[in-house]
């Protein structure tokens, strides 16, 4: 969603500015690694949302048991993607809720929408010269052309 994506992007930039100003470069590097992982997961979510959309687009042509099987295969594929991210990150706990918990349309949809515009707002941050006042002015101008 628009507001959640903006809040996420703005918070990310604010934390990074604060860590730079405090000279906390080790913490900054760790935080930037966290952002990178969040972005990698966001990509997996976006791909999953697209794949699920295709399954439902073709749902009219398939009997209910076939549709159920397609969804189960999709969920297993999504969880495998999450496991692959976790291995890449060398983490034993990352994405635990997604891997071990229930995955359903509502959870996928809400999560992917929540983060979908973060790259857009991050790009606006770059356009603002990485200045909070300029950034907020850019955002205000989006709503009041």
Where in this protein do the model-derived segments appear?
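Pan-zinc metallopeptidase signature
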Residues: 45-145
